[in-house]
Protein backbone atom coordinates (compact mmCIF):
# COMPACT_ATOMS: atom_id res chain seq x y z
CA UNK A 1 0.00 0.00 0.00
CA UNK A 2 1.27 3.40 -0.91
CA UNK A 3 -0.21 5.53 1.86
CA UNK A 4 -0.86 4.66 5.46
CA UNK A 5 -4.18 5.81 6.92
CA UNK A 6 -2.27 8.21 9.18
CA UNK A 7 -0.49 9.82 6.22
CA UNK A 8 -3.79 10.10 4.34
CA UNK A 9 -5.48 11.73 7.34
CA UNK A 10 -2.57 14.17 7.65
CA UNK A 11 -2.91 15.21 4.00
CA UNK A 12 -6.68 15.61 4.35
CA UNK A 13 -6.20 17.78 7.46
CA UNK A 14 -3.78 20.01 5.57
CA UNK A 15 -6.03 20.63 2.56
CA UNK A 16 -9.61 20.35 3.80
CA UNK A 17 -12.01 23.22 3.15
CA UNK A 18 -14.42 22.49 6.03
CA UNK A 19 -14.42 20.20 9.07
CA UNK A 20 -15.89 17.06 7.44
CA UNK A 21 -14.18 17.51 4.07
CA UNK A 22 -12.73 14.47 2.32
CA UNK A 23 -13.78 14.98 -1.29
CA UNK A 24 -13.10 18.58 -2.24
CA UNK A 25 -10.88 19.08 -5.30
CA UNK A 26 -8.04 20.36 -3.10
CA UNK A 27 -8.00 17.19 -1.01
CA UNK A 28 -8.26 14.94 -4.06
CA UNK A 29 -5.42 16.78 -5.83
CA UNK A 30 -3.21 16.55 -2.73
CA UNK A 31 -3.84 12.80 -2.36
CA UNK A 32 -3.17 12.18 -6.06
CA UNK A 33 0.03 14.23 -5.86
CA UNK A 34 1.26 12.07 -2.99
CA UNK A 35 0.59 8.87 -4.96
CA UNK A 36 2.25 10.36 -8.05
CA UNK A 37 5.38 11.29 -6.12
CA UNK A 38 5.54 7.78 -4.62
CA UNK A 39 5.29 6.18 -8.07
CA UNK A 40 7.88 8.58 -9.49
CA UNK A 41 10.35 7.39 -6.85
CA UNK A 42 9.37 3.78 -7.58
CA UNK A 43 10.27 4.22 -11.26
CA UNK A 44 13.76 5.45 -10.40
CA UNK A 45 14.47 1.94 -9.08
CA UNK A 46 12.22 -0.10 -11.41
CA UNK A 47 12.69 1.36 -14.86
CA UNK A 48 11.00 -1.53 -16.69
CA UNK A 49 7.77 -1.53 -14.70
CA UNK A 50 5.59 -0.46 -17.61
CA UNK A 51 2.36 -1.78 -16.10
CA UNK A 52 2.58 0.63 -13.18
CA UNK A 53 3.71 3.44 -15.49
CA UNK A 54 0.30 3.27 -17.18
CA UNK A 55 -1.32 3.68 -13.77
CA UNK A 56 0.89 6.70 -13.13
CA UNK A 57 -0.25 8.29 -16.39
CA UNK A 58 -3.88 7.73 -15.40
CA UNK A 59 -3.27 9.41 -12.03
CA UNK A 60 -1.59 12.37 -13.70
CA UNK A 61 -4.57 12.70 -16.06
CA UNK A 62 -7.01 12.58 -13.14
CA UNK A 63 -5.06 15.28 -11.32
CA UNK A 64 -4.96 17.42 -14.46
CA UNK A 65 -8.76 17.16 -14.82
CA UNK A 66 -9.29 18.16 -11.19
CA UNK A 67 -6.89 21.09 -11.57
CA UNK A 68 -8.70 22.27 -14.70
CA UNK A 69 -12.04 22.02 -12.88
CA UNK A 70 -10.75 23.97 -9.89
CA UNK A 71 -9.19 26.63 -12.15
CA UNK A 72 -12.52 27.08 -13.93
CA UNK A 73 -14.58 27.23 -10.71
CA UNK A 74 -12.29 29.20 -8.40
CA UNK A 75 -8.94 30.57 -9.61
CA UNK A 76 -7.89 31.70 -6.13
CA UNK A 77 -8.21 28.21 -4.64
CA UNK A 78 -6.47 26.80 -7.74
CA UNK A 79 -3.48 29.11 -7.27
CA UNK A 80 -3.33 28.26 -3.58
CA UNK A 81 -3.20 24.50 -4.29
CA UNK A 82 -0.56 24.92 -7.00
CA UNK A 83 1.61 27.00 -4.68
CA UNK A 84 1.25 24.66 -1.69
CA UNK A 85 2.03 21.53 -3.69
CA UNK A 86 4.76 23.12 -5.77
CA UNK A 87 3.29 22.06 -9.12
CA UNK A 88 4.47 23.54 -12.42
CA UNK A 89 1.32 24.85 -14.07
From Swiss-Prot:
UniProt xrefs under Pfam families: Ribosomal_S15
Key words, A-Z: Ribonucleoprotein, Ribosomal protein, RNA-binding, rRNA-binding
GO biological process, alphabetically ordered: translation
InterPro entries attached to this UniProt entry: Ribosomal_uS15 (IPR000589), Ribosomal_uS15_bac-type (IPR005290), uS15_NS1_RNA-bd_sf (IPR009068)
CDD domains registered for this protein in UniProt: Ribosomal_S15p_S13e
A GO term, aspect molecular function: rRNA binding
GO CC annotation: cytosolic small ribosomal subunit
Subunit structure: Part of the 30S ribosomal subunit. Forms a bridge to the 50S subunit in the 70S ribosome, contacting the 23S rRNA.
Family: Belongs to the universal ribosomal protein uS15 family.
Role noted for this protein: One of the primary rRNA binding proteins, it binds directly to 16S rRNA where it helps nucleate assembly of the platform of the 30S subunit by binding and bridging several RNA helices of the 16S rRNA.
Record's protein name: Small ribosomal subunit protein uS15
Amino acid sequence: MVMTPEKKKEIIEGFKVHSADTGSPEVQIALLSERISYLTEHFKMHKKDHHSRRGLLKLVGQRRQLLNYLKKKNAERYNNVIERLGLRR
